[in-house]
Amino acid sequence: GLLSSLSSVAKHVLPHVVPVIAEHL
């Protein structure tokens, strides 16, 4: 379903996004 698609996308995206956000904090 849509939620499972979003969760799978989040699992791929978050590992790349979190370090970038952390650098700017």
UniProtKB/Swiss-Prot annotation:
InterPro entries: Caerin_1 (IPR010000)
Keyword RNA-binding included in the entry's annotation: no
Compartments reported by the entry: Secreted
Pfam family, one: Caerin_1
GO biological process: defense response to bacterium
Keyword hit for Heme: no
One of the record's GO cellular component terms: extracellular region
Segments forming a coiled coil: none
Tissue expression summary: Expressed by the skin parotoid and/or rostral glands.
Record-listed Leucine amide modification sites: 25
Keywords attached to this entry: Amidation, Amphibian defense peptide, Antibiotic, Antimicrobial, Secreted
Family from the record: Belongs to the frog skin active peptide (FSAP) family. Caerin subfamily.
Function in brief: Antibacterial peptide, that adopts an alpha helical conformation which can disrupt bacterial membranes. Each caerin displays a different antimicrobial specificity.
Free-text note regarding domains: Contains two amphipathic alpha helix regions separated by a region of less-defined helicity and greater flexibility.
Protein name, UniProt field: Caerin-1.4
Organism per entry: Ranoidea gilleni (Centralian tree frog)
Lineage summary: Eukaryota, Metazoa, Chordata, Craniata, Vertebrata
